[in-house]
Amino acid sequence: MTDLFSSPDHTLDALGLRCPEPVMMVRKTVRNMQPGETLLIIADDPATTRDIPGFCTFMEHELVAKETDGLPYRYLIRKGG
């Protein structure tokens, strides 16, 4: 089985940051990416389990994968076009 998290185009370490900082950093990072590129987000704020999927839906990006069973949380998103 392929690890979806193993080769992202970009990585964002949001460990130790609390809402709303992780989503603000994701938004800033995604703004500088090309459509189709992927971003791995590593976070430990429980609010990200709600905020990251909501951000993807609202901004029309794809939440490719998420791992939220334990810390740190990992999210892989693909920038929409």
UniProtKB/Swiss-Prot annotation:
Changing residue 51 to A: Binds IscS, 67% modified tRNA produced. This is Sulfur carrier protein TusA. The active site is at 19 (cysteine persulfide intermediate). Pathway: tRNA modification. PROSITE patterns: UPF0033 (PS01148). GO terms for biological process: tRNA wobble position uridine thiolation. GO terms for cellular component: cytoplasm. InterPro entries: Sulphur_carrier_TusA (IPR022931), TusA-like (IPR001455), TusA-like_sf (IPR036868). Forms a heterotetramer with IscS. Certain pairs of proteins can bind simultaneously to IscS but TusA does not seem to be one of them. IscU can displace TusA from IscS. Changing residue 31 to A: No binding of IscS, 30% modified tRNA produced. Keywords: Cytoplasm, tRNA processing. It comes from Escherichia coli O157:H7. It is found in: Cytoplasm. CDD domains: SirA (cd03423). Sulfur carrier protein involved in sulfur trafficking in the cell. Part of a sulfur-relay system required for 2-thiolation during synthesis of 2-thiouridine of the modified wobble base 5-methylaminomethyl-2-thiouridine (mnm(5)s(2)U) in tRNA. Interacts with IscS and stimulates its cysteine desulfurase activity. Accepts an activated sulfur from IscS, which is then transferred to TusD, and thus determines the direction of sulfur flow from IscS to 2-thiouridine formation. Also appears to be involved in sulfur transfer for the biosynthesis of molybdopterin. GO terms for molecular function: sulfur carrier activity. The gene is tusA. Belongs to the sulfur carrier protein TusA family. Pfam families: TusA.
